[in-house]
């Protein structure tokens, strides 16, 4: 059975169904209805069309996905003004970064991944580039913030994560917020969390850091920030 994802403000296990027939192995367009219902009987439904395409062929063992990039000068032109700061976020996925060039390009800050959790209930792993990134960012006079990629599914876990983050960053000059990065919505239904519960998890992470003098924030796309977080 295909996994169907949904979330409710207070029900940690809402019913999520797709009404209509479809076949993911057969190319075509399928008119379907997505239905979500909570334990109080509140129901929402949305009509949508599922498009199933032929898979793209890939030759030579490579990837069919094209690598895209953004012109930083274009970002500055669009977003930089007297009321804004423009910067980047970095992790091991960017490899070894020349932060002098980052500074020269016009970046004013860097949000650095300190680490991540290995799935729900998993260990905390320091980003292998964290120490290099933060040392060189600070040496190049860039403002620094932090983020941790979390799978926290309860307040106790969130507190432990915040304490772990504090241990990693306490010896550095962190002048921007420490962010809670929760992106694992593909696993959300298995966590037995409501959106209210998830917000309480984030608040626990924040309050633990704020008690030590750090500013905090959420890390996420505009869509999730508007839809998920209160």
Language-model segment annotations:
Residues 157-160, 224-230:
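Glycine-rich, charge-decorated loop segments at or immediately adjacent to ligand/cofactor-binding or catalytic sites
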Residues 10-52:
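Serine/threonine-rich, repeat-prone extracellular segments and beta-strand-based repeat modules
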Residues 209-227:
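Aromatic-lined carbohydrate-recognition surfaces of secreted/lumenal glycan-active proteins
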Residues 60-92:
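Functionally critical loop-and-helix segments that line ligand-binding/catalytic clefts
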Residues 51-61:
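Extracellular interdomain linker/stem segments of modular secreted and single-pass surface proteins
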Residues 1-12, 57:
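Solvent-exposed, low-complexity, repeat-rich "mucin-like" stalks and linkers
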Residues 80-206, 210-212:
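Substrate-binding cleft of extracellular glycoside hydrolase catalytic domains
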């Amino acid at each position: 059975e295909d996994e169907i994802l949904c979330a409710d403000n207070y029900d940690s296990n809402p019913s999520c169904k797709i009404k209509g027939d479809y076949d993911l192995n057969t190319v075509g367009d399928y008119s379907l209805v997505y239905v979500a219902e909570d334990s109080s009987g509140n129901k929402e439904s949305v009509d949508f069309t599922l498009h199933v395409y032929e898979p793209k062929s890939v030759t030579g063992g490579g990837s069919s996905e094209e690598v895209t990039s953004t012109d930083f000068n274009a970002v500055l032109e669009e977003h930089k003004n007297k009321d804004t700061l423009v910067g980047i976020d970095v992790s091991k996925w960017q490899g070894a970064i020349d932060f002098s060039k980052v500074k020269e390009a016009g970046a004013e800050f860097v949000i650095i991944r300190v680490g991540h959790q290995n799935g729900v209930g998993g260990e905390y792993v320091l980003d292998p580039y964290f120490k290099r990134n933060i040392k060189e960012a600070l040496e190049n006079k860039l403002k620094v913030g932090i983020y941790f990629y979390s799978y926290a599914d309860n307040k106790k876990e969130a507190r432990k994560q915040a304490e772990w983050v504090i241990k990693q960053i306490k010896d550095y000059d962190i002048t921007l917020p420490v962010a809670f990065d929760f992106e694992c919505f593909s696993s959300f239904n298995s966590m037995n969390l409501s959106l209210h519960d998830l917000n309480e998890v984030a608040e626990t992470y924040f309050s633990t850091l704020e008690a030590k003098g750090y500013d905090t924030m959420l890390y996420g796309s505009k869509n999730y920030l508007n839809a998920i977080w209160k």
